[in-house]
């Protein structure tokens, strides 16, 4: 296998106009891998550390320190490594950093190199990334969980829930799912417009109307699904990312004008699941409320997937604690929360081994990098969350999945409704 001869990085812009790291890894056979690192708006306190410069430049959000760490320390460390030994490369990066949360070199520096190394190795092997990572059995196309209404930290609307998603579960293929999602998205625009609400967009391409409540936003989406000619619950299901840590203050959930306990929030979710065809609720409770998650999973876990994002931060140790406590039943997979590919692989493997579902995810600050599309197929996630079917940094991932589906041909299988507990048994 080819050896790494050069590693470098540069500062580029993400989809929110903030700097991020782009890393490149070069091999001695001419192969090269490039990776752009995403960045989140609502970040969990347990995430790996994103290194920013501070000061006035880019309002303190520059990443020149992280870039310098790649160009100097990391480049020196990885010279001569065999590119196909991903675990050894990632272990070397973790050891070089020397901190628990990758705060010395920066998770944004480490992740960029980790992904770029895998891409270079895939090119050297003459394989697409999904096949290089996932092997010959990588063939399941994920259900696109399309965020078509943005609230919370992703928008300037009054809606507290951060993401309202549609899941085209009734499609026969990924390409059909994408078409259904796009048609509902366009129908939603006309529904919102007809009610005199704003059709402005949030960070992830979804609309950000001033809906009165969570139910009002869900009603808009149900109307759009019907207007597009589809049946809610049969063709298209709904999903929520509550991101509840964002409105948890002083021991209470400040939700829709009131102050609520975890028990009261659980009642809210039970009502929503009873009224709407919801298949997934992400981060329904504050990120350290283990007891609350266990109770909620016991109550609702057989009906919907309870997804840990800020709760698990793609961290195998936190996920293991969740498994032990029967807290949540699905893992949101964000490579930049943990900071290397192999740690991400370990988290997904642990989830699958214990019957937890997995959803590959973008961040609200994205680049045109399509790695997560390949990883969703490679790791058999069955679900991917990468925004609305609009804005090129979101669509880039969907388009990559179209290419993968076409390349797989008859071997391709679309996960569809089988991906969700509401349709099991």
Swiss-Prot record:
Primary location class: cytoplasm
Keyword Cytoplasm in record: yes
Alphabetic keyword roster: Cytoplasm, Glycolysis, Lyase, Magnesium, Metal-binding, Secreted
EC number: 4.2.1.11
GO biological process: glycolytic process
Cofactor binding mode and count: Binds a second Mg(2+) ion via substrate during catalysis.
Keyword Nuclease tagged: no
GO molecular function: magnesium ion binding; phosphopyruvate hydratase activity
PROSITE patterns: ENOLASE
GO cellular component: a single term: phosphopyruvate hydratase complex
Residues given in the record as (2R)-2-phosphoglycerate binding sites: 162, 334, 363-364, 385
Pathway per the UniProt entry: Carbohydrate degradation; glycolysis; pyruvate from D-glyceraldehyde 3-phosphate: step 4/5
Subcellular location field: Cytoplasm; Secreted; Cell surface
Active-site residues (renumbered): 204 (proton donor), 334 (proton acceptor)
InterPro entries assigned: Enolase, Enolase-like_C_sf, Enolase-like_N, Enolase_C, Enolase_CS, Enolase_N
Chemical reaction(s) catalysed: (2R)-2-phosphoglycerate = phosphoenolpyruvate + H2O
Positions annotated to bind Mg(2+): 241, 282, 309
Reported cofactor(s): Mg(2+)
Function: Catalyzes the reversible conversion of 2-phosphoglycerate (2-PG) into phosphoenolpyruvate (PEP). It is essential for the degradation of carbohydrates via glycolysis.
Family (UniProt): Belongs to the enolase family.
HAMAP family the record matches: Enolase
Protein name: Enolase
Gene for this chain: eno
């Amino acid at each position: 296998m080819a050896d790494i001869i050069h590693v470098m990085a540069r500062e580029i812009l993400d989809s929110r106009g903030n700097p991020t790291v782009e890393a490149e890894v070069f091999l001695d056979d001419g192969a090269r891998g490039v990776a752009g690192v995403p960045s989140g708006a609502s970040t969990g306190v347990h995430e790996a550390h994103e290194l920013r410069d501070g000061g006035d430049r880019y309002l303190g959000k520059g990443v020149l320190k992280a870039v310098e760490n790649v160009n100097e320390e990391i480049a020196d460390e990885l010279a001569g490594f065999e590119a196909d030994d991903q675990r050894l490369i990632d272990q070397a990066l973790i050891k070089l950093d020397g901190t628990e949360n990758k705060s010395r070199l920066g998770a944004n520096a480490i992740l960029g190199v980790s992904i770029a190394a895998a891409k270079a190795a895939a090119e050297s092997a003459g394989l697409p990334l999904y096949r290089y990572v996932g092997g010959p059995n990588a063939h399941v196309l994920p259900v696109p969980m399309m965020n078509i209404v943005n609230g919370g930290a992703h928008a300037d609307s009054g809606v507290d829930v951060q993401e309202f998603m549609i899941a085209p579960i009734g499609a026969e293929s990924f390409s059909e799912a994408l078409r259904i999602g796009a048609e509902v998205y366009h129908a939603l625009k006309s529904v919102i417009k007809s009610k005199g609400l704003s059709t402005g967009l949030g960070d992830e391409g979804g609309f950000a109307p001033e809906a009165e409540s969570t139910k009002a936003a869900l009603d808009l989406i149900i109307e759009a699904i019907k207007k597009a000619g589809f049946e809610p619950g049969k063709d298209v299901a709904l999903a929520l990312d509550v991101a509840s840590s964002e409105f948890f203050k002083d021991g209470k959930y400040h939700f829709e004008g009131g102050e609520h306990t975890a028990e009261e929030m659980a009642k809210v979710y039970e009502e929503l699941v009873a009224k709407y065809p919801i298949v997934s609720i992400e981060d329904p409770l504050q990120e350290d409320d283990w007891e609350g998650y266990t109770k909620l999973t016991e109550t609702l876990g057989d009906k919907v997937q309870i997804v840990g994002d800020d709760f698990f931060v793609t961290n195998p140790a936190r996920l293991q604690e969740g498994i032990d406590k029967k807290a949540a039943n699905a893992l949101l997979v964000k490579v930049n929360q943990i900071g290397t590919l192999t740690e991400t692989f370990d988290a997904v493997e642990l989830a699958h081994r214990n019957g937890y579902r997995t959803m590959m995810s973008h961040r609200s600050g994205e680049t045109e990098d399509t790695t997560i599309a390949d990883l969703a197929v490679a790791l058999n996630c069955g679900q991917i969350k990468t925004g609305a079917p609009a804005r090129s940094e979101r669509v880039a991932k969907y388009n990559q999945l179209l290419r993968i589906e076409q390349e797989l041909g008859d071997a391709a299988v679309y996960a569809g409704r089988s991906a969700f507990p509401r349709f099991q048994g």
